[in-house]
């Protein structure tokens, strides 16, 4: 065996905005995008609730001055049994800047910050909790754990790359051994999406060791087409319309654009397309109907720009420039 070992660390995931909540709830709970918004709205302004901040956010940062609320929110959450065992340090980790959670510049042009527990009602969470529905508890759990993870230490792990020469054929395995769970301790039952060999756990190995192959097999495999959209991943695609732009210079420019629709309208756009018979749900996947494909063909023939998501992204980017003063209204119209 040839072994290369490197100690690494991983910062916590970003806080949630509405699109990330819709994507997560679609994959974990099977919720339509509209349901996630409905449940979030109830947690925000439902009678006797009001335990999260404005849910229709499309940014995953907080203002830097909200760092002072961290101790109070953490203490309020840990009163309840659901979050009591999460080992948030007595001095929470405040990460600022683009790689952290508190980033003023990341909020430029945004009306609302990331979705987090409401500091103004955190002290009465124990009283409110019994009144919540099962779905409301599920969604609040997602939001609360995301917030707690954001102020916990990095996940530290040892990355091992093992190479094995077997009769002239070199095999490689990459994996991890945990050193300190850090923020991952906030998620005992699930993990953020991870794919590939880097995510697997390997036992302790030493360079120079000899090993024995047990029941080796050769498998024939084929590449698979991209997965179909569910409502959560479709919301994400609508938010990141820049990915559908071929021009590399435009792609970078459009990454900060709002994409197709807004957090408040994307779920309703999907609902409307289903209601009109252009989209349907098959085994939790969103698929175009024959009517939808026929309409797409007509519009694309008439003018490809009508069905180009990149064009919409460019228009949204132009409107954003008007909002922040980078472009005047007359120039934008022209």
Locate the predicted segments by residue.
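Core catalytic DNA strand-manipulation module of type IA topoisomerases
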Residues: 1-334
């Amino acid at each position: 065996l040839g072994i290369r070992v490197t100690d690494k660390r991983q910062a916590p995931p970003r806080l949630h905005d509405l699109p990330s909540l819709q994507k997560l709830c679609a994959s974990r709970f099977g919720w339509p995008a509209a349901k996630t918004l409905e449940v979030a709205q109830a947690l925000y302004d439902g009678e006797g609730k009001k335990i999260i901040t404005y849910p229709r956010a499309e940014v995953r940062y907080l203002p830097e001055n909200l760092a002072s609320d961290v101790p109070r929110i953490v203490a309020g959450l840990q009163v309840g049994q659901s979050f009591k065992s999460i080992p948030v340090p007595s001095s929470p980790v405040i990460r600022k800047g683009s790689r952290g959670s508190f980033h003023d510049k990341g909020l430029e042009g945004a009306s609302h910050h990331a979705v987090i527990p409401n500091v103004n009602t955190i002290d009465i969470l124990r009283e409110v909790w019994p009144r919540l529905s099962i779905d409301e508890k599920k969604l609040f759990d997602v939001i609360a754990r995301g917030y707690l993870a954001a102020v916990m230490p990095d996940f530290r792990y040892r990355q091992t790359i093992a190479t094995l020469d077997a009769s002239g054929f070199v095999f490689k395995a990459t994996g991890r051994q945990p050193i300190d769970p850090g923020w991952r301790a906030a998620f005992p039952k699930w993990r953020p999406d991870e794919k590939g060999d880097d995510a697997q756990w390997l036992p302790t190995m030493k360079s120079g060791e000899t090993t024995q192959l047990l029941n080796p097999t050769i498998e024939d495999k084929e590449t698979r087409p991209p997965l179909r959209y569910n409502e959560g991943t479709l919301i994400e695609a609508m938010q990141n319309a820049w990915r559908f732009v071929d021009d590399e210079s435009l792609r970078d420019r459009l990454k900060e654009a709002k994409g197709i629709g807004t957090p408040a309208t994307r779920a309703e756009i999907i609902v409307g397309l289903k209601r009109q018979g252009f989209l349907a749900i098959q085994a939790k996947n969103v698929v175009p109907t024959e009517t939808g494909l026929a309409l797409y063909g007509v519009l694309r023939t008439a003018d490809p720009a009508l069905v180009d998501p990149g064009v919409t992204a460019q228009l949204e980017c132009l409107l954003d420039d008007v909002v922040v003063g980078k472009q005047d209204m007359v120039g934008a119209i022209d």
